[in-house]
Design a protein with these regions (language model features):
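N-terminal positively charged helical leader segments and presequences
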Residues: 1-102
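Glycine-biased, small-residue-rich flexible motifs in mid-sequence functional cores and linkers
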Residues: 2-12, 76-396
Length: 396
């Protein structure tokens, strides 16, 4: 069997990963390739493995051809301090995002990549909120920070901006998921906030540096936002809103969805009311959010502690792997709580050492799909369950 031990030259490995990102097309075959060969240089050089993993002829042609000019800008961007590239094969890839549907092949991060492991709530809503909606976004963000959670949002105008700004003002941790490259501030009015988050938080994008705003990128931005968070809180939203897309994606990932009720006369309350009718939790204060998320947050804190103990290469700068900070795990521990052991035992009994799909686990355990998905996430973070392409086994 060929030796695919990762090469010692991180710059060449990063270039190979950049080429894999830039070749475009469906991400799933490229993820399979990195699962099969976790060294990007060896992966893209193995034509047979590329074909076996499902890469298209167009993708193969892009990998074999000359490196596009866009990669030069990306390589230059990665040379700056606190600029990182985290691939699917990387142990620093965010564990919650890994468990979401259709995760991205790689993430560009400006700022602190350890924040992608920190328990977070996505706070989303209208780009043109009411004054009350803006105030609620800021108040909930401050309270979530006080409970030890990070606040994630999309750096859009309105609710996103209010949540990010209030988090920074409270001395908390915030993650901004972008629909552009990590170096592009959009909207332009948020250039200062973009710079502040790069310094005190984390900017995250699946797009190459230099990529400008494109309409088709923002739904995928919402997918990542829903995927890195323990749950999604919708402050204000019209019936047709990007915030509702984020909420739907969160539910599909087995995450909690929360919504604030509002006046029946406020058009921006209708989206929240629709979510509540569809099963989202109605919340009136941040404590209700933290109580609902406490079990999974504690499991994520355990994953943080294990990651702290793991050996790493590099110092976290210039694209090298980054160790999560000890205070992240300490803050996450504040969210610990007990869980319903009877339901977990039912799911554990339904699991075996042969890979089992979600539908069969729901049938065996007689729990709901949402319950099983959430419990599997927690058990996987604890190291009790292993996931194999949508099927699950006991790991011990």
């Amino acid at each position: 069997m060929p030796d695919h031990t990762p090469d010692a030259d991180p710059a060449e490995a990063r270039l190979a990963l950049l080429r894999l990102v830039a070749c475009g097309g469906p991400a799933a075959p490229r993820r399979r390739l990195l699962e099969h060969i976790p060294d990007p240089r060896a992966a893209i050089a193995d034509a047979a493995a590329c074909r076996d993993c499902g890469l298209s002829s167009a993708q193969l042609g892009a990998l074999r051809g000359p490196a596009p000019d866009t990669l030069r800008h990306a390589r230059d961007w990665l040379q700056a301090p606190r600029h990182h590239l985290i691939g699917w094969h990387d142990p620093d890839y965010p564990p919650l995002l890994r468990r979401s549907p259709a995760p991205p092949l790689a993430l560009f991060v400006a700022g602190d990549p350890a924040l992608l492991w920190h328990p977070a709530v996505a706070v989303v809503g209208s780009r043109a909120p009411t004054p009350g909606g803006r105030d609620n976004a800021a108040a909930f963000a401050r309270a979530l920070v006080g409970s030890g959670l990070a606040v994630a949002s999309g750096l859009a105008a309105g609710i996103d901006t209010a949540a990010h700004a209030a988090t920074l003002a409270a001395g908390g941790h915030t993650v901004a998921v972008l629909g552009t490259g990590p170096d592009i501030a959009y909207p332009r009015g948020n250039r200062e906030l973009h710079a502040r988050i790069a310094t005190a938080g984390a900017l995250v994008s699946e797009h190459l540096p230099g990529t400008g705003p494109r309409k088709e990128h923002f739904p995928s931005r919402n997918r990542i936002l829903a995927g890195i968070a323990l749950g999604t809180l919708v402050i204000e939203a019209a019936e047709r809103s990007g915030a509702l897309i984020t909420a739907r994606l969160a539910a599909e990932s087995g995450r909690e969805v929360f919504a604030l009720p509002g006046s029946i006369h406020n058009p921006l309350a209708r989206g929240c009311h629709r979510l509540i009718r569809d099963g989202a939790a109605l919340v009136e204060n941040a404590q209700q959010v933290t109580e609902a998320l406490a079990p999974v947050a504690e499991a994520l804190a355990g994953a943080l502690r294990r990651r702290l103990a793991a050996p790493i290469a590099g110092d976290g700068e210039h694209g090298a792997p980054a160790r999560v900070a000890p205070e992240r795990a300490a803050q996450a521990q504040r969210l610990g709580a007990t869980r319903d052991d009877a339901d977990y035992q039912r799911l554990w009994n339904a699991l075996g050492f042969d890979p089992t799909g979600m539908d069969e686990l729901v049938q065996r355990s007689r729990l709901t799909t949402a319950q099983v998905s959430s419990m599997l996430l927690l058990m996987e973070l604890e190291g009790r369950v292993a996931a194999h392409h949508g099927r699950y086994t006991r790991s011990r």
